Amino acid sequence: MAQGPSQCPALLGAPASTTDGTQEARVPLDGAFWIPRPPAGSPKGCFACVSKPPALQAAAAPAPEPSASPPMAPTLFPMESKSSKTDSVRASGVPQACKHLAEKKTMTNPTTVIEVYPDTTEVNDYYLWSIFNFVYLNFCCLGFIALAYSLKVRDKKLLNDLNGAVEDAKTARLFNITSSALAASCIILIFIFLRYPLTDY
């Protein structure tokens, strides 16, 4: 029985099927490029930094045996931007640096600030002189005032206040000189009156 024209594939222009199992090569589309698939498996974190590079791992893997099945065509991806292409190339087997090491490199070193304080050790506080005047020559409590200023000088020296320590040291010296001079004058007058009493005149 003869077949009609609608049932004959040759009349419709359809290609005849092949029996050898081969497949026609796919023609790449316009505006597309080929990108190999990234290696399977999740990253191992910091241990991936010290592991073997991908090139050595690929060389150690056994070669695939030839099979009778036809080779599979590579996967076709659409056009991507430049940044996406760079990321794809990095994921295709190029070893990347550890992210923890990258974070350490980006961290800036903290700056060390050294504060230089003025030298207050050369400021004289007249502490011993003030104690002597307070104990022996405390004329009108001037020795006590001088001792108070001497203690203020010591406190300001601990606080590294050079200007305040110098001013209080000058005041303590002034009170010490005044107390010593007045007390010494009183002692001399007392000795004179004891040596030459007023009844002799």
UniProtKB/Swiss-Prot annotation:
Transmembrane segments: 128-148, 174-194
Residue ranges, Cytoplasmic side: 149-173
Keyword Ion transport attributed: no
Listed Pro residues bias regions: 63-73
Entries under Pfam families matching the protein: CD225
Positions of the UniProt region annotated as Disordered: 1-23, 60-88
Entry's Gene Ontology cellular component terms: plasma membrane
Bilayer disposition of the protein: Multi-pass membrane protein
Residues exposed to the Extracellular side: 1-127, 195-201
InterPro entries, per database record: CD225/Dispanin_fam (IPR007593), IFITM_antiviral_protein (IPR051517)
Lipidation sites (S-palmitoyl cysteine): 140-141
Subcellular location: Cell membrane
Keyword terms, alphabetized: Cell membrane, Lipoprotein, Membrane, Palmitate, Transmembrane, Transmembrane helix
Location (main, coarse): membrane
Domain of life: Eukaryota
Similarity comment: Belongs to the CD225/Dispanin family.
Name recorded for this polypeptide: Interferon-induced transmembrane protein 10
The species this protein was found in: Mus musculus
Name of the coding gene: Ifitm10
